[in-house]
């Protein structure tokens, strides 16, 4: 079974992907860097979880399984 993420992480990730659709890629390190530039997130753990979920959303978008 996969990791269940907090609702707040999902909410922020969906909002950022919708607001800046062309900035994100399937590369976690790239997404982490972009997230640091456009959002002021003080917690490194929180930033990494959001970047990881955005990465997962982009992979699902490519595979055609994103609803």
Swiss-Prot record:
GO terms for molecular function: structural constituent of ribosome. One of its GO terms (biological process) is translation. GO terms for cellular component: ribonucleoprotein complex; ribosome. The keyword Hydrolase does not apply. InterPro entries: Ribosomal_eS17, Ribosomal_eS17_sf. It comes from the Archaea. Belongs to the eukaryotic ribosomal protein eS17 family. This is Small ribosomal subunit protein eS17. The gene is rps17e.
């Amino acid at each position: 079974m996969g990791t269940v993420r907090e609702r707040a992480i999902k909410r922020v990730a969906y909002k950022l992907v919708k607001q800046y659709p062309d900035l994100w890629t399937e590369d976690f390190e790239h997404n982490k860097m972009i997230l640091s530039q456009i959002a002021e997130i003080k917690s490194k753990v929180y930033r990494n979880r959001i970047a990881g979920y955005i990465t997962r959303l982009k992979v699902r978008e490519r595979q055609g399984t994103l609803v």
